[in-house]
Structure formats: C-alpha cells, structure tokens
Amino acid sequence: MNIEQVIRDYLPQIIHMSLGTSQDNKPWVCEVHFVYDDNLNLYFRSLTSRRHSQDIAANPRVAGNIVKQHVVGEYPLGLYFEGTAELLGNEDERRAVEPLFKERLGAAADILTEAANPDGHQFYKITVANWYAFGKFDGDKGQKVKLAWNGGTASQDATDA
C-alpha cells in the first residue's frame, strides 16, 4: 500500500478539517476549510482574533483530522496529522497560495486585499510532520498507518497514533 497516494487521493474529497490547538494546557478544536499544495502542506484562512489563531501564536504545534462523514455500518476512512502552524505574514507567500483558495474553495477575488488588513482573514500554513490514515486499505481489516513527512518520525508503526 502506498500511504502517500492514499492521502493524495483522499484530500480532494473533503474541504474542511478539524484543527486542534493548545495554549496553557487548554486544548481547543475547531473546523476550518482548507487547501493543500503538492508538498502536502495545509493552508487555511482565519481571523487573528479567533481562539485557534491565538493558540497558534503562542504554541505552533497543531494536530487535526480530515474525515468524511459516514453512516452506521459504513467503515470510516480518515486522515490525521500533526505538525506546526504559522501565520503567513509575507505578501509573496500569501500570493503564492491564493490560487489554491480560489480553485478549490471558490474564494472571493479580494482575499489578498483582505489579508493586507490586520483585521481581515489571514493565511495560515500547516507544515505536516506526520500523516496517519485510518481505514480499510488492503482487505477487510481496518488499520491505521503512519507516514513521516517533513522531518517527522520515521516509524511506520502507527500503534502510537
């Protein structure tokens, strides 16, 4: 099984993710719409006043999942990740990812203008260190597999996931 290909095939199917952040030992989870690039970095937009944005400013380590809703009796398939998040403050960085938001989410034409306003929605990047995929990949047995990415731990064993 090629876990990277599983991830690449699954990401286009889902437009929102659950994002976990933490500050001062107080965890938080929220839903955000996301886009991704060829290197499997994740991007989202948010106001800096939101709790998850404040958490990221204090503690950039994040985790989350990207899961398609399923019905009773249907075996779930999902992606999980851990990595670091950062505010993209550089205009060139924002300009580089703007097309991803327009193509995937139909974002408005003025999202760069809005991001130039400190009170507007800003661009955030998540550099994923480890991906995990959960589902039935090779037969009838469900499994969770790990893919180290961008300097993540090299173990393919997902028992710690």
Protein language model features and the residues they cover:
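Extreme N-terminal tail/first-helix region
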Residues: 1-16, 151-161
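Short amphipathic alpha-helical segments
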Residues: 3-7, 51, 56-60
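Alpha-helix boundary recognition
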Residues: 11-12, 57-58, 102
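Short Pro/Gly-enriched beta-strand edge/turn motifs at strand-loop
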Residues: 13-18, 105-109
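Short beta-strand segments
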Residues: 14-48, 56, 62-68, 75-80
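Short, surface-exposed beta-strand-loop junctions and turns on beta-sheet-rich folds
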Residues: 50-52, 71, 140-142
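Short secondary-structure boundary segments
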Residues: 68-69, 128
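Charged, gly/pro-rich active-site loop segments
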Residues: 77-161
